[in-house]
Amino acid sequence: MYSVNAPVPAAVNELAAELRPALTEFDRVRERHEQTLLVKRVPASDRKELRTAWQTAQDALSGAPAVEARVSEVDTFENPPNGSSPVVYLAVESPGIHRLHERLCSVFDPVPVMEGGDDYDPHVTLARDASGFQGQRAVDAIHGRQVGPVTWTIDELYLYDAEYGERVDTLSLPA
């Protein structure tokens, strides 16, 4: 899977590290290098298709400004549309990220139930997979917790290859 992502600052990684003790009941806890902000998935089945898709994304983002983002709360997806549940995340408030997402949805079809319109919830995943009584207790203990706040400027986006866990290319904002 490929995606356009926004980097998160060290202060967001520090929030995640502070929350880590509350995430011990989860089967999968994201490491610092895995904490990112997904802006839009990119349809491509290989690197050749990806080059074309990335050019399309860059064209759609042409003239896009740097945007502000803010994290101040922990939230959960109890039943995410794909993958295991529950998912615990830092909720990202950013009208600008929504506008960037909309630009990309104008050239790439939104993933049903996950992207486009009200379905897109910008977030930084912290952990997923917690079952049984202990899992529910872990979710209840962290859901809605106030954190930070951390505010930052997103002045670049990057193309991410999830298979290899690496950045493929970067786009500076304003684009």
Where are these regions (language model features)?
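Basic, often amphipathic N-terminal segments
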Residues: 1-68, 96-148, 166-175
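Compositionally biased, intrinsically disordered low-complexity regions enriched in proline and serine
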Residues: 3, 90, 106, 159-161
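Exposed loop/turn and edge beta-strand positions of beta-sandwich/beta-sheet ligand-binding modules
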Residues: 33, 84-86, 120, 153
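Helix-adjacent hinge/juxtasegments
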Residues: 63-102
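Short proline/glycine- and acidic-rich turn/helix-capping motifs at secondary-structure junctions
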Residues: 72-80, 120-122, 155-166
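Short, flexible loop segments at boundaries between secondary-structure elements
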Residues: 144-160
